[in-house]
Protein backbone atom coordinates (compact mmCIF):
# COMPACT_ATOMS: atom_id res chain seq x y z
CA UNK A 1 0.00 0.00 0.00
CA UNK A 2 1.64 3.30 -1.09
CA UNK A 3 2.05 6.02 1.51
CA UNK A 4 0.75 9.56 1.11
CA UNK A 5 4.13 10.91 0.05
CA UNK A 6 4.54 8.11 -2.52
CA UNK A 7 1.13 8.97 -3.97
CA UNK A 8 2.11 12.64 -4.10
CA UNK A 9 5.28 11.72 -6.01
CA UNK A 10 3.24 9.58 -8.42
CA UNK A 11 0.76 12.42 -9.01
CA UNK A 12 3.65 14.82 -9.56
CA UNK A 13 5.28 12.47 -12.10
CA UNK A 14 1.98 12.13 -13.98
CA UNK A 15 1.55 15.92 -13.97
CA UNK A 16 5.09 16.45 -15.29
CA UNK A 17 4.53 13.87 -18.03
CA UNK A 18 1.24 15.54 -19.00
CA UNK A 19 2.85 18.98 -19.09
CA UNK A 20 5.72 17.70 -21.27
CA UNK A 21 3.32 16.10 -23.74
CA UNK A 22 1.17 19.25 -23.85
CA UNK A 23 4.34 21.29 -24.45
CA UNK A 24 5.40 19.00 -27.30
CA UNK A 25 1.96 19.20 -28.94
CA UNK A 26 1.78 22.96 -28.37
CA UNK A 27 5.17 23.38 -30.06
CA UNK A 28 3.79 21.47 -33.06
CA UNK A 29 0.71 23.70 -32.99
CA UNK A 30 2.78 26.89 -32.93
CA UNK A 31 4.93 25.64 -35.81
CA UNK A 32 1.89 24.81 -37.96
CA UNK A 33 2.64 21.08 -37.98
CA UNK A 34 -0.41 19.87 -36.07
CA UNK A 35 -3.40 18.92 -38.22
CA UNK A 36 -5.75 19.15 -35.23
CA UNK A 37 -5.04 22.85 -34.69
CA UNK A 38 -5.99 26.21 -36.08
CA UNK A 39 -4.73 29.74 -35.61
CA UNK A 40 -6.99 32.76 -35.29
CA UNK A 41 -6.41 36.46 -34.75
CA UNK A 42 -8.86 38.73 -33.00
CA UNK A 43 -10.68 41.49 -34.86
CA UNK A 44 -8.82 44.08 -32.79
CA UNK A 45 -5.53 42.57 -33.83
CA UNK A 46 -6.46 42.63 -37.52
CA UNK A 47 -7.81 46.19 -37.30
CA UNK A 48 -4.63 47.40 -35.58
CA UNK A 49 -2.24 46.16 -38.26
CA UNK A 50 -4.11 45.66 -41.56
CA UNK A 51 -4.73 48.28 -44.20
CA UNK A 52 -8.47 48.18 -45.07
CA UNK A 53 -7.62 49.43 -48.57
CA UNK A 54 -5.22 46.53 -49.20
CA UNK A 55 -6.75 43.06 -48.84
CA UNK A 56 -3.29 41.49 -49.22
CA UNK A 57 -2.15 43.21 -46.02
CA UNK A 58 -4.20 40.65 -44.07
CA UNK A 59 -1.97 37.84 -45.35
CA UNK A 60 1.20 39.81 -44.67
CA UNK A 61 0.11 40.60 -41.10
CA UNK A 62 -0.97 37.01 -40.42
CA UNK A 63 2.38 35.73 -41.71
CA UNK A 64 4.37 38.23 -39.63
CA UNK A 65 2.45 37.43 -36.44
CA UNK A 66 2.68 33.67 -37.01
CA UNK A 67 6.44 33.97 -37.52
CA UNK A 68 6.79 35.76 -34.18
CA UNK A 69 4.70 33.12 -32.41
CA UNK A 70 6.80 30.32 -33.96
CA UNK A 71 10.04 32.05 -32.92
CA UNK A 72 8.95 32.57 -29.30
CA UNK A 73 11.55 31.39 -26.80
CA UNK A 74 10.34 30.45 -23.35
CA UNK A 75 11.92 31.31 -20.04
CA UNK A 76 10.87 30.27 -16.56
CA UNK A 77 8.77 33.38 -16.05
CA UNK A 78 6.41 32.96 -19.00
CA UNK A 79 5.79 29.21 -18.75
CA UNK A 80 4.92 28.43 -15.11
CA UNK A 81 3.09 25.17 -15.88
CA UNK A 82 5.54 23.87 -18.48
CA UNK A 83 2.92 23.53 -21.23
CA UNK A 84 4.22 26.32 -23.51
CA UNK A 85 0.66 27.51 -24.14
CA UNK A 86 1.06 31.29 -23.74
CA UNK A 87 3.44 33.98 -24.88
CA UNK A 88 3.95 37.73 -25.10
CA UNK A 89 5.57 39.59 -27.99
CA UNK A 90 5.65 42.98 -29.69
CA UNK A 91 4.65 43.88 -33.22
CA UNK A 92 4.93 47.41 -34.60
CA UNK A 93 5.31 48.79 -31.09
CA UNK A 94 2.22 47.08 -29.68
CA UNK A 95 2.18 44.36 -27.06
CA UNK A 96 0.45 41.14 -28.12
CA UNK A 97 -0.38 37.82 -26.50
CA UNK A 98 -0.84 34.41 -27.98
CA UNK A 99 -2.67 31.61 -26.17
CA UNK A 100 -3.36 27.96 -26.98
CA UNK A 101 -6.66 26.54 -25.74
CA UNK A 102 -7.74 22.90 -25.80
CA UNK A 103 -11.16 21.98 -27.22
CA UNK A 104 -13.07 18.82 -28.01
CA UNK A 105 -13.07 17.86 -31.74
CA UNK A 106 -16.33 19.78 -32.35
CA UNK A 107 -14.79 22.94 -30.83
CA UNK A 108 -17.84 23.18 -28.55
CA UNK A 109 -16.35 22.28 -25.17
CA UNK A 110 -13.02 22.04 -23.41
CA UNK A 111 -10.99 18.90 -24.04
CA UNK A 112 -11.12 15.99 -21.59
CA UNK A 113 -7.46 15.22 -22.22
CA UNK A 114 -5.21 17.72 -24.04
CA UNK A 115 -2.55 15.04 -24.54
CA UNK A 116 -4.92 12.87 -26.64
CA UNK A 117 -5.22 14.14 -30.22
CA UNK A 118 -8.32 12.03 -30.82
CA UNK A 119 -10.06 14.10 -28.11
CA UNK A 120 -8.41 17.48 -28.61
CA UNK A 121 -8.19 20.26 -31.16
CA UNK A 122 -5.99 23.22 -30.34
CA UNK A 123 -6.86 26.83 -31.11
CA UNK A 124 -4.00 29.32 -31.05
CA UNK A 125 -5.38 32.83 -30.61
CA UNK A 126 -3.29 35.94 -31.31
CA UNK A 127 -4.62 39.09 -29.67
CA UNK A 128 -3.71 42.56 -28.50
CA UNK A 129 -2.71 42.61 -24.84
CA UNK A 130 -5.47 45.18 -24.29
CA UNK A 131 -8.05 42.59 -25.43
CA UNK A 132 -7.11 40.04 -22.75
Segments and roles (model prediction):
Residues 1-2:
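An acidic, glycine-rich, mixed-charge low-complexity segment common to nucleic-acid enzymes
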Residues 10-90:
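Compact soluble domain cores
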Residues 83-132:
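Short, compact, well-ordered microdomains
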Amino acid sequence: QPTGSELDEEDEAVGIGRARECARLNDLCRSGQLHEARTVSTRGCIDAFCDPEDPMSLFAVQAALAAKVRAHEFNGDDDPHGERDFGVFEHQGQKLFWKIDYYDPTLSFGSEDPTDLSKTHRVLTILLASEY
